C-alpha cells in the first residue's frame, strides 16, 4: 500500500498536467543575487517543461545584494543589475537594468525578495528595507503575490568572510536563518515562503551529506540547484515535485529521489511558520 499511494498521487499530477495551456503561464520575478541565480536560472525551466507548466522567469542579479542595497537601487533608479530573462527555456541576459525596468516589463504573478546570505540570519538587517521594498513593489505590481525566498546556510568548511558572524557553525547559521524567517513572516504574513534553505538543510541530513554547495555557499550544479528549484516548482505549480520525471544528466536517480523528497518535505514543514 505504501508504494501504491505515491503512485496514485503522481498519476493524478500527470493527469492535471495534461490540461495546462499557454494561458496558464506563470511569470516570476526574483529581486535577488547569486542565490536566486542558483535557485531559478538552471533547473526551474526544465522542471516546469517536464511538468507541462509554461513559465517565464526574470532574475535581477547583483552579486551579494542585500535588502538595503536593493532599496537604494530602487530609490535612485540605478541600472546596476544583470537581468536574466528566461522564456521557452531560453535564457537571455540584459546588462545595465534597473529594478523599476524589471517591475514594469511584465505583469508578474510572483515577485520574490530575499536577504543577502551574509545577513540572512541577522534579524536587525531586514528592516526598514524589507517593508519599504514591499510597499514600493506593490505600487508597481499590486496584483502580484509577494514571496520570500529563504536562503541556506554555508557548508561546514566554508571560507566565506561572513561565516564568523555565525561562529563558523552551520547549525548556528541554520538556526539564525530560521529565527529570522519566523520574525519576518510574523511582521509580513502576506509573504509566501519559499523554503529553499530548509530544503538544503534536509538534503544535507541524508546520504548526500554536506555536498550541496560547490564553493561553500553557492549551490552545486549537479543537485544543489536542483533541490532549490524543486521547492520553487512545487510551490508555484501545486504539483508534487517527486512526480516530476526531469533530472539533469549529472545526477543519479538516487540524488534525484533524495533532493525531490527534501524539497517536498521542506514545503510540508514550512506550514509551521
Task: For each feature predicted by the language model, list its residue ranges.
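Positively charged n-region of N-terminal signal peptides that target proteins for export
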Residues: 1-4
Amino acid at each position: 500500500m505504501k508504494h501504491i499511494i505515491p503512485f496514485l498521487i503522481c498519476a493524478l499530477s500527470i493527469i492535471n498536467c495534461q490540461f495546462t495551456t499557454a494561458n496558464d503561464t506563470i511569470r516570476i520575478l526574483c529581486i535577488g543575487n547569486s542565490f536566486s541565480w542558483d535557485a531559478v536560472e538552471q533547473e526551474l525551466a526544465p522542471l516546469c517543461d517536464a511538468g507541462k507548466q509554461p513559465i517565464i522567469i526574470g532574475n535581477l542579479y547583483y552579486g551579494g545584494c542585500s535588502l538595503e542595497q536593493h532599496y537604494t537601487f530602487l530609490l535612485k533608479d540605478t541600472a546596476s543589475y544583470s537581468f536574466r530573462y528566461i522564456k521557452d527555456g531560453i535564457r537571455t541576459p540584459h546588462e545595465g537594468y534597473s529594478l523599476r525596468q524589471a517591475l514594469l516589463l511584465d505583469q508578474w504573478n510572483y515577485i520574490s525578495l530575499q536577504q543577502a546570505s551574509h545577513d540572512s540570519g541577522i534579524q536587525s538587517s531586514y528592516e526598514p528595507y524589507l517593508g519599504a521594498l514591499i510597499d514600493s513593489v506593490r505600487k508597481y505590481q499590486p496584483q502580484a503575490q509577494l514571496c520570500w525566498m529563504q536562503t541556506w546556510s554555508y557548508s561546514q568548511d566554508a571560507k566565506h568572510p561572513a561565516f564568523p558572524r555565525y561562529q563558523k557553525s552551520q547549525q548556528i547559521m541554520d538556526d539564525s536563518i530560521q529565527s529570522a524567517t519566523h520574525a519576518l513572516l510574523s511582521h509580513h504574513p502576506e509573504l509566501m515562503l519559499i523554503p529553499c534553505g530548509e530544503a538544503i538543510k534536509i538534503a544535507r541530513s541524508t546520504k548526500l551529506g554536506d555536498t550541496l554547495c560547490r564553493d561553500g555557499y553557492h549551490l552545486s550544479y549537479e543537485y544543489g540547484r536542483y533541490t532549490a528549484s524543486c521547492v520553487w516548482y512545487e510551490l508555484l505549480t501545486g504539483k508534487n515535485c517527486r512526480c516530476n520525471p526531469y533530472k539533469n544528466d549529472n545526477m543519479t536517480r538516487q540524488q534525484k529521489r533524495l533532493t525531490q523528497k527534501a524539497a517536498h518535505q521542506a514545503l510540508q514543514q514550512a506550514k509551521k511558520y
